[in-house]
Amino acid sequence: MRFKAELMNAPEMRRALYRIAHEIVEANKGTEGLALVGIHTRGIPLAHRIARFIAEFEGKEVPVGVLDITLYRDDLTEIGYRPQVRETRIPFDLTGKAIVLVDDVLYTGRTARAALDALIDLGRPRRIYLAVLVDRGHRELPIRADFVGKNVPTSRNEVVKVKVEEVDGEDRVELWEKEGA
């Protein structure tokens, strides 16, 4: 792959997540009954950051859970016979809560669909929102994000890479082009 552009640097990511945190609290009319669930892998640190921002300006802790969607994917046969299943840890009851699913990039909508299926198997939330750092378009399913850090129109031969300090050692969003495209 060939690097094309930096889409967001660390301060821009921070500002986008801070704005998303405010939008979540506004949409929910406060923090009552609110919880965040990060989708493996990079949705987890993003969810924790949003929760920290909410605690900063609201003075209330919002619970954060971790969701693995591996077994809910519709492309399991394409990713091999031994998919890497990771931990799902949701230390609170989902029933009656407003849940914000957090992911790094929204593309086809298939990850979000799998996350919805996994979440609903664990309880019956009052409402489910979707928050993403980057929405790159090209939906294959009728899914949209409620909270978006940045909309980035892309072509199908481009790849959006989100890097987070907790996983990758730096905060940055990059646009790459597939070779031979």
From Swiss-Prot:
Under Gene3D superfamilies, the record lists: 3.40.50.2020
List where the motif PRPP-binding lies.
99-111
Residues involved in substrate binding: 41-42, 82, 86, 103-111, 136, 160
Q: Which organism is it from?
A: Thermus aquaticus
Q: What is this protein called?
A: Bifunctional protein PyrR
Q: Its biological function?
A: Probably regulates transcriptional attenuation of the pyrimidine nucleotide (pyr) operon in response to exogenous pyrimidines. In contrast to pyr attenuation in Bacillus spp., PyrR from Thermus could act as a translational repressor: the binding of PyrR at its proposed recognition site in the transcript would prevent initiation of translation of the leader peptide, resulting in terminator formation and reduced expression of downstream genes.
Might you give the EC number(s) for this enzyme? 2.4.2.9
Q: Which UniProt keywords apply?
A: Glycosyltransferase, Repressor, RNA-binding, Transcription, Transcription regulation, Transcription termination, Transferase
Identify one Pfam family in the record: Pribosyltran
The signal peptide here is none
Which enzyme class? Answer: transferase
> Which InterPro entries does the entry link to?
PRibTrfase_dom (IPR000836), PRTase-like (IPR029057), PyrR (IPR023050), PyrR_bifunctional (IPR050137)
* Family statement drawn from the similarity comment of this UniProt entry: Belongs to the purine/pyrimidine phosphoribosyltransferase family. PyrR subfamily.
Biological process (GO), any one = DNA-templated transcription termination
Q: What top-level branch of life does the organism fall under?
A: Bacteria
Q: Which reaction does it catalyse?
A: UMP + diphosphate = 5-phospho-alpha-D-ribose 1-diphosphate + uracil
Q: Name one GO molecular function term.
A: uracil phosphoribosyltransferase activity
Q: Which CDD domains match?
A: PRTases_typeI
